[in-house]
Amino acid sequence: MSRMPFDRQKIVEAVKEAKARAKPRNFTQSVEVAVNLKDIDLKRPENRFKLEVVLPHGRGKDVKIAVIADGAVAEAARRLGLDVISSAELEEIAQSPRQARKLAKKYDFFIAEAPLMPKIGRYLGKYLGPRNKMPVVVPPTMSNLEPIVEKLKKTVRIQLKNNPVVHAPVGTEKMSDEEIAENIETVLNAIIGKLERGESQIKSVYVKTTMGPAVKVKG
């Protein structure tokens, strides 16, 4: 693993300051990290990436998951109290772009049984793809979704596309500074692992709450 460009204490200090500078709100604010990159040509497709990162301390809040399935997979989803979208409902949603957009916005993650993926790609691909929310695919015989769901609850999806900056949620203001800092380290390590020249391509890192100002992590 590459040497971290920032030590843990510097990250903890930035988290502490970001939380302190956030005005109290009537909701629990998320904490986000923004990683600015340099010396990277995003016109070359091989330099762009999508990543799934499992945060050691989770996201600190509930994650909304929908399951697109019939049969065994749908039953497994209902047992876990997850929202289920049947193949028939999928056909209905396909007729309404407004409904499809609403669906893509409402859920953080989708799980889908493999046989429905061609339809999902056709009907929902243009709404889920740009949001980096294409489903986790499972076989139609799967009867236990719990391991996948537990992993998704701790997962963040990040992508580097047209601009040299990567954003990721890394917790909430109610989590300890150390927990958030460790989550940030995990995200940074994942990003460094995708960069051709590793940590030397990280220009700066900022931490902020949903409504608060961005605080730079001192290098």
From Swiss-Prot:
GO terms for cellular component: large ribosomal subunit. Pfam families: Ribosomal_L1. GO terms for biological process: regulation of translation; translation. One of its GO terms (molecular function) is rRNA binding. The keyword DNA-binding does not apply. Keywords: Repressor, Ribonucleoprotein, Ribosomal protein, RNA-binding, rRNA-binding, Translation regulation, tRNA-binding. InterPro entries: Ribosomal_uL1, Ribosomal_uL1-like, Ribosomal_uL1/biogenesis, Ribosomal_uL1_3-a/b-sand, Ribosomal_uL1_arc, Ribosomal_uL1_CS. It comes from the Archaea. Belongs to the universal ribosomal protein uL1 family. Part of the 50S ribosomal subunit. NCBIfam families: PRK04203.1. PANTHER family: 54S RIBOSOMAL PROTEIN L1, MITOCHONDRIAL, LARGE RIBOSOMAL SUBUNIT PROTEIN UL1M. Binds directly to 23S rRNA. Probably involved in E site tRNA release. Protein L1 is also a translational repressor protein, it controls the translation of its operon by binding to its mRNA. This is Large ribosomal subunit protein uL1. It comes from Pyrococcus abyssi (strain GE5 / Orsay). The lineage of its organism: Archaea, Methanobacteriati, Methanobacteriota, Thermococci, Thermococcales.
